[in-house]
Amino acid sequence: MAKLTKRMRVIREKVDGTKLYEINDAVALLKELATAKFVESVDVAVNLGIDPRKSDQNVRGATVLPHGTGRDVRVAVFTQGANAEAAKAAGAELVGMDDLAEKIKAGEMNFDVVIASPDAMRVVGMLGQILGPRGLMPNPKTGTVTPNVAEAVKNAKAGQVRYRNDKNGIIHTTIGKVDFTPVQLKENLEALISALKKAKPAVAKGVYVKKVSISTTMGAGVAVDQASLETAN
């Protein structure tokens, strides 16, 4: 506990919770404070001006970050025929239909993303209680239910992030690793914010992107001055 206490004391001394940091300063601060013995992820929380209680104001989707996430993503694909061969060629680790469903029912969950062609949803639908709670259920809004499974596999491998607001209207996702360059993290964040703005519900009123904070896995949040991002306008 002593190490954690010391770490948190340093964070409190370094991070001004009332300040908006220019993006490069924010990234530099995260890198300075990232002292864990592993390469920490850089996470982002975006507070949106939506009413999450209303279904027509919920924001959900996916976007490919220009510099990826720094993670090796394992992909499972439910499809058959020519699509199965295309999915394998695109790099999917697991491809199948009922046989893949049986593996998952037996507890084989060695994957990070599940993709399905529309004709496979009859099989995937029976796995809702297993995949749903883990956030793995394929959905057309995130591009994981698609006739072009090969492209979806390539996107997942290239660093696609899926996003969905929580009950407080906040989007939580990752934009890379702490060993990314400042430019890579900035451009990944800008790509995410741009995607969120394109996904703005038509009925949302007032300021849409209210607050943007970045943090490392073990660190505190640092509020980013949106004027320092290319998506400011």
UniProtKB/Swiss-Prot annotation:
Family classification:
Belongs to the universal ribosomal protein uL1 family.
| Ribosomal protein among keywords | yes
The taxonomy runs: Bacteria, Pseudomonadati, Pseudomonadota, Gammaproteobacteria, Alteromonadales
Name this polypeptide is given: Large ribosomal subunit protein uL1
Q: Record's superkingdom?
A: Bacteria
| Keywords, comma-separated and alphabetical | Repressor, Ribonucleoprotein, Ribosomal protein, RNA-binding, rRNA-binding, Translation regulation, tRNA-binding
Assembly, in brief, is: Part of the 50S ribosomal subunit.
Q: Which gene encodes it?
A: rplA
**Could you tell me which species this protein originates from?**
Shewanella oneidensis (strain ATCC 700550 / JCM 31522 / CIP 106686 / LMG 19005 / NCIMB 14063 / MR-1)
Q: Fetch the PROSITE patterns from UniProt.
A: RIBOSOMAL_L1
Molecular function (GO) terms listed?
rRNA binding; structural constituent of ribosome; tRNA binding
User: Record keywords: Ribonucleoprotein included?
Assistant: yes
InterPro entries per record: Ribosom_uL1_bac-type, Ribosomal_uL1, Ribosomal_uL1-like, Ribosomal_uL1/biogenesis, Ribosomal_uL1_3-a/b-sand, Ribosomal_uL1_CS
